[in-house]
Amino acid sequence: MSQITIALTKGRIEEDTVKLLTQAGFDMSFMADKGRSLIFESPDGRFRFLLVKGPDVTTYVRHGVADLGIVGKDILFEHPTGYLELLDLNFGLCKFSLASVPSYDPHDHKRKRIATKYPTVATNYFNQKGEDVEIISIQGSVEISPVLGLADAIVDIVETGHTLSANGLLVFEDICRVSVRLIANQASLKNNPDIMPFVAKIESLVGRREVAFK
């Protein structure tokens, strides 16, 4: 049996992935008491998990350090190459939205400034609309950008909308759905015969729509 190394996004995605794999019949109790460790191996040696930040999941998979990766689609939009996207795991559901202060006019054709942590998503969105905009990359709390006059609007991930409301912003348009995805290293798929049976088991579970985390 060949070991499968999985790069896993730390935090909420990690927690929901453990629930998913438990539902699929895998013993994930070894992940219960993590402490400060970032690398975990199952007692039977079948799996090794690497707990990393979302953007780094694609890096570990692309370079073959991890066979599989579990990461939000928002990250994949910004890092679109070097892996195969296998499954929509149907949890971590949210959306990309265009938001701004109530006085914002999306139909005003003046050149707009758009603040975002996702420049590729924002650029593609406005290109599809045929609008020329200035993209301002923000790494922190993008919600305050329109309030402070740095940007006319923002493109950001929205789950409940509470953060937008708390900062006086409204959603003007939903851009696309986002969820957690399973990705793979192409060489690993070819060389590790245990990966596809594992993927098929997860796909069967997700296909029965039994995955519903809140």
UniProtKB/Swiss-Prot annotation:
Pfam families: HisG. It catalyses: 1-(5-phospho-beta-D-ribosyl)-ATP + diphosphate = 5-phospho-alpha-D-ribose 1-diphosphate + ATP. Keywords: Amino-acid biosynthesis, ATP-binding, Cytoplasm, Glycosyltransferase, Histidine biosynthesis, Nucleotide-binding, Transferase. NCBIfam families: hisG (TIGR00070). Belongs to the ATP phosphoribosyltransferase family. Short subfamily. GO terms for biological process: L-histidine biosynthetic process. It is an enzyme of class 2 (transferase). Its EC number is 2.4.2.17. The keyword Lyase does not apply. GO terms for molecular function: ATP binding; ATP phosphoribosyltransferase activity. Heteromultimer composed of HisG and HisZ subunits. Catalyzes the condensation of ATP and 5-phosphoribose 1-diphosphate to form N'-(5'-phosphoribosyl)-ATP (PR-ATP). Has a crucial role in the pathway because the rate of histidine biosynthesis seems to be controlled primarily by regulation of HisG enzymatic activity. It comes from Streptococcus gordonii (strain Challis / ATCC 35105 / BCRC 15272 / CH1 / DL1 / V288). Pathway: Amino-acid biosynthesis; L-histidine biosynthesis; L-histidine from 5-phospho-alpha-D-ribose 1-diphosphate: step 1/9. It is found in: Cytoplasm. This is ATP phosphoribosyltransferase. One of its GO terms (cellular component) is cytoplasm. Lacks the C-terminal regulatory region which is replaced by HisZ.
